[in-house]
Amino acid sequence: MGPYSVFTAATILATVAVTCNAALVAQTSKEWSQCSGGEGPIVDVIISGCSAVIHGGHDSPKRLATAFNNRGVVYKFKGEYDRALDDYNQAILLNPSYANAYNNRGVIYRLKGDYDRAIKDYDEAIWLDSSIPAFFYNRAIAYTEKQDYDRAIADFEMVLRFNSKNALALYGRGVVRLKKGDSQTGSADIADAKAINPNVAEEFEHSARR
C-alpha cells in the first residue's frame, strides 16, 4: 500500500498554497507528464513519475488516486500483480468513486483466478459508470472463465449494444455459445467477427490474458 491516507493527502493539500513555489509547480508538472505517459510509454519513466507524485503528496486525493492507478497499470503490464493490486487498493481508498480503478483491480483478481472478487469489482465499476463498454467486456471474460455462460453472453450483448460491429464481443459471444453446445449461432457469431476483423481470434485470446 502507498504511504498516504486520505487524511494525509487532504492535510498536505491544505498547505500547498502556502508552501508551493514556481520550481515546485514545474517539477510537479514534469512528474505528472511522466506519470501520464506524456514523455513516452517507457514503463520505468511512468513508474518514476507516478512515485514522485505519490511521495510528493502535493495533489488532491483524486489526483493521487490517479497516480496510484497509473502506476498500477504499469505494474500489471510488467506482471507484478501484487504491486498493481496494492496500488489499485490505494487508488480506491483515496477515491471511492474511481470506476477505472475498480475495473483495473477486477482485472488483477481475474488474472489471479479470483473470479468472484473480479466480478464484484466490475459490478462496482459498472454501477459507477455504465457508459464504458470495456467494463462489461471484462466482466464477460470473468463470467466465461467461471463458466457462467448465460451471464457472459448477456455482458457480450451489452457491449454489442454500444457497437454492433465490435468483433471481440461477437467472437466472445460465439465462443460461449459453442461452449453451451449452440453450434449454429456460435459459428455464425465467429464468422461475423472474422469478417469484421480477420485477426479477432488472436486478439480475443490476448484480451483474455491481459
Describe the predicted segments one by one.
Residues S29-Q34, L178-K179, S183-R210:
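Terminal, low-structured helical/coil segments at or just beyond the last alpha-helical repeat
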